[in-house]
């Protein structure tokens, strides 16, 4: 069952775990992947989960199952982390040099899923913010090794130029006649 936004939802910084969280009522608190150093100053205090946040979250609840085969719990987890990333993270500069250039020109839009190729590995990413030349993407894969010293963890974000986004490989289904 998908969690739908309620008027008592709100953002708060969870000091015990050192991450941004979403209070989903009096009983449930969802912990995002985002630590204080990556958050905007307002995210360190209690904030309403407002209409803009709810619309963004709901659009992802709608888009994700059309692209990926996921459980309802995974869709909610991705959508809440992506909403936090879109509204609560500090701006980033592109770091495209970690990734291979795509041979295909893609239309990048918020909520679309792409692959990044880095050191012969493929990483699944979700666009959470889009500009004219670049996109802020959130890692859906468990991890992506960027270099010997840097690894991107699941739900972490990185900004890349559009020419680094590779379309998802088409699934081929063989039907016996």
Swiss-Prot record:
GO terms for biological process: division septum assembly; FtsZ-dependent cytokinesis. It comes from the Bacteria. It holds the Pfam family ZapC_C. It is found in: Cytoplasm. Keywords: Cell cycle, Cell division, Cytoplasm, Septation. Its main location: cytoplasm. GO terms for cellular component: cytoplasm. Disulfide bonds: none annotated. Belongs to the ZapC family. HAMAP family: ZapC (MF_00906). Interacts directly with FtsZ. Contributes to the efficiency of the cell division process by stabilizing the polymeric form of the cell division protein FtsZ. Acts by promoting interactions between FtsZ protofilaments and suppressing the GTPase activity of FtsZ. This is Cell division protein ZapC. The gene is zapC.
């Amino acid at each position: 069952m998908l969690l739908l936004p309620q008027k008592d939802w709100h953002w708060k910084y969870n000091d015990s775990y050192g991450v941004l969280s979403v209070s989903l009522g009096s009983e449930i608190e969802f912990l995002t992947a985002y630590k204080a150093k990556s958050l905007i100053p307002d995210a360190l205090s209690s904030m309403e989960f407002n209409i803009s946040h709810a619309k963004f979250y709901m659009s992802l609840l709608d888009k994700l199952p059309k692209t990926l085969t996921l459980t309802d719990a995974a869709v909610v987890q991705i959508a809440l982390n992506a909403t936090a990333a879109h509204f609560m993270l500090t701006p980033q500069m592109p770091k495209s040099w970690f990734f291979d250039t795509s041979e295909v020109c893609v239309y990048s839009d918020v909520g679309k899923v792409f692959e990044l190729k880095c050191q012969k590995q493929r990483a699944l990413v979700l666009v959470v913010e889009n500009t004219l030349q670049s996109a802020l993407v959130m890692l859906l894969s468990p991890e992506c090794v960027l270099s010997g010293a840097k690894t991107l963890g699941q739900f972490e974000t990185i900004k890349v130029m559009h020419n680094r986004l590779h379309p998802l490989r088409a699934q081929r289904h063989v039907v016996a006649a």
